[in-house]
UniProtKB/Swiss-Prot annotation:
Lyase among keywords: yes
NCBIfam families: PRK00951.1-5, PRK00951.2-1, PRK00951.2-4
Broad class of the protein's primary localization: cytoplasm
Coiled coil: none
InterPro entries: IGPD_sf, ImidazoleglycerolP_deHydtase, ImidazoleglycerP_deHydtase_CS, Ribosomal_Su5_D2-typ_SF
Molecular-function annotations in GO: imidazoleglycerol-phosphate dehydratase activity
Signal sequence, renumbered to the chain: none
Enzyme class: lyase
GO terms, biological process: L-histidine biosynthetic process
Record has Oxidoreductase as a keyword: no
Species this protein is from: Mesorhizobium japonicum (strain LMG 29417 / CECT 9101 / MAFF 303099)
Keyword terms of this UniProt record: Amino-acid biosynthesis, Cytoplasm, Histidine biosynthesis, Lyase
Entry GO terms, CC: cytoplasm
Protein's UniProt name: Imidazoleglycerol-phosphate dehydratase
Length: 199
């Protein structure tokens, strides 16, 4: 399997973002978005997926965090799409239930080339510190759309909003790790009867 690494950037009047990923990494991350809680979540995404990530983001944080979070999801998804190429030799599907104290969250992934998000997660507060909880969904929507993955995220239960958000990132990370693993029985095959995972 060829090295699965790529870069992507996005520059608008609202944000200036650069991302690099190495899918077959060890979970090293170098994250600086200007949004502390989001940096923490991206670090979890990298660490538990074993995807090495470098993220640099400058956004209009004087307005709010929305553009920075969403556009980082866009750039990260685009980098993953480039890194995966034809998506040959991958397991493609994965799901995981991930526990953190009182919280349990499920993530299921199909690296299909067809972007879709099903989101069954609710928060009891609009904020975690200064971070808008609605931005968790916005990030995963942007990631799924631009990475070409079908992603289902369901929070079964939980009381702590930080834990709910963190289990979303960790569950998606662990599911991504499993779905992107090389398939030793089909090392050069596109895992689709269509012969393509381009959408």
């Amino acid at each position: 399997m060829a090295p699965r690494s790529a870069e992507a950037s996005r520059k608008t009047k609202e944000t200036d973002i650069s991302v690099s990923v190495h899918v077959d990494g060890s979970g090293k991350s170098d994250i600086a978005t200007g949004v502390g809680f989001f940096d923490h979540m991206l670090d979890q995404l990298s660490r538990h997926s074993l995807i090495d990530m470098t993220v640099r983001a400058k956004g209009d944080l004087h307005i709010d965090d929305h553009h920075t979070v969403e556009d980082t999801g866009i750039a990260l998804g685009q980098a993953l799409t480039k890194a995966l190429g034809e998506r040959r030799g991958i397991m493609r599907y994965a799901s995981i239930d991930l526990a953190m104290d009182e919280t349990l969250t499920r993530a299921a992934i199909d690296v299909s080339g067809r972007p879709f998000l099903v989101w069954n997660v609710s928060f009891s507060s609009p904020k975690i510190g200064t971070f808008d909880t609605e931005l968790v969904r916005e990030f995963f929507q942007a990631l799924a759309q631009n990475a070409g993955i079908t992603l289902h995220v369901t929070n079964h239960y939980g009381a702590n909003n930080h834990h709910i958000a963190e289990t979303c990132f960790k569950a998606v990370a662990r599911a991504l790790r499993a779905a992107l693993e090389p398939d030793p029985r089909q090392p050069d095959a596109v895992p689709s009867t269509k012969g393509s995972l381009k959408g």
